[in-house]
Amino acid sequence: MPREIITLQAGQCGNSVGQQFWQQLCQEHGINKDGNLEDFATEGGDRKDVFFYQSDDTRYIPRAILLDLEPRVLHSIQASPYKNIYNPENFYIHKDGTGAGNNWGMGYSMGEQVHEDILDMIDREADGSDSLEGFMMLHSIAGGTGSGLGSYMLERLNDRFPKKLIQTYSVFPNTQDGDIVVQPYNSLLSMRRLTQNADSVVVLDNGALTRIAADRLHVMNPSFEQTNQLVSTVMSASTTTLRYPGYMHNDLVGIVASLIPTPRCHFLMTSYTPFSGENVEQAKTVRKTTVLDVMRRLLQPKNRMVSTNPTKKSCYMSILNIIQGEADPSDVHKSLMRIRERRLATFIPWGPASIQVALTKKSPYVTSSHRVSGLMLANHTGIATLFKRIVAQYSTLRKRNAFLESYKREVPFKDGLGEFDEAKEVVQGLIAEYEEAEDADYLTKETAPTDEAEDKRAG
């Protein structure tokens, strides 16, 4: 029984990442550039229908909706080698084509104006699914479209599909040297929606992605294409258990339930090893990829795709390792024992200290130089330090009332700047929740989340 997932790509970053993600899925499932199954793709055992549907002429078409307020990236996708795999009706480019000017308010307001057209596309895709499980959204939170239009769509999806899961892959800005001066404003406003309207958020930040790409590829300034390749590798790895199902973690709700012990703490960080791929071929090869080696590397902070400054109390709430390739379950058991003996991972004091492992097969159609590769999805309290940096940078700008005029012109701010204050309160509540989770008496505390009434997730 397929449990379909509809993918929404919003803005320049979301669509660039999405383009590479679909290319990777096509290669892994033996689908050619026109959407036809290659003659050699006869192995079976994979579920293509989670992410693709078959058209009347039996071509595989992504269940994807591509949204942007300016045409450049979508036009480049429409002229790319894989242009024929998409449903042309699922491209939405705003008729003015002016973009959102790196302004969350403008992206949000434009979403409000055009939401009926976009929801028609989503309804059409949902009606074409037998048993829709949920949505995946790809976007960044620093600019205008991915953050503003993305926020608006999260709210609408919650209203229209209250029982469906929403998972996002959200690219956070490099908080050290971002190229958009107003990114703290856009990030904070988006964070509120990610907290209240998503069930699970995979956090990737540009600072960490650039560092990992530079480290592995030996290039000083990795291109966006190279960092997007890392994101699409993580996305394809995190969906392998859905596409090559085993007994466990074979649907999105299973993955989310195993990683998120309390509903608000649903921001996940990832590690992946070893990196290889078309655009990453300069990556230094790691000679011996045993299960233990892969699992140990996944726990190394330098492999995390999030820049955090963990404190002494920071700890894991949950870990799911997705191991692809030739892995023997007894090796996994031994590796887990070794990790426990060496105390390589510190867990919350009030829950089970368990690393969950899902073994999945690799695509038979993609050659890999590694026997085993692994992705770690982890819920770690240290992620709150990233949110603290966003709040601190927001407060610095707000104190000076810097760059607020362009926001005041937009609909969400017509009655003042309360939208900012509410967002800050929600994010501070989230930070407090993660910090409280580090205490042994977390579950027995009587404090309820302040914004429970606002919480719209499918819990």
From Swiss-Prot:
It is found in: Cytoplasm, Cytoskeleton, Microtubule organizing center, Spindle pole body. SUPFAM superfamilies: Tubulin C-terminal domain-like (SSF55307), Tubulin nucleotide-binding domain-like (SSF52490). One of its GO terms (biological process) is mitotic cytokinesis, division site positioning. Residues 440-459 are annotated as: Disordered. The keyword Ribonucleoprotein does not apply. GTP binds at A142, G143, G144, T145, G146, S147, G148. One of its GO terms (cellular component) is gamma-tubulin ring complex. One of its GO terms (molecular function) is GTP binding. Keywords: Cytoplasm, Cytoskeleton, GTP-binding, Microtubule, Nucleotide-binding. Its main location: cytoplasm. The keyword Cytoplasm applies. Tubulin is the major constituent of microtubules. The gamma chain is found at microtubule organizing centers (MTOC) such as the spindle poles or the centrosome, suggesting that it is involved in the minus-end nucleation of microtubule assembly. Belongs to the tubulin family. This is Tubulin gamma chain. The gene is TUB4.
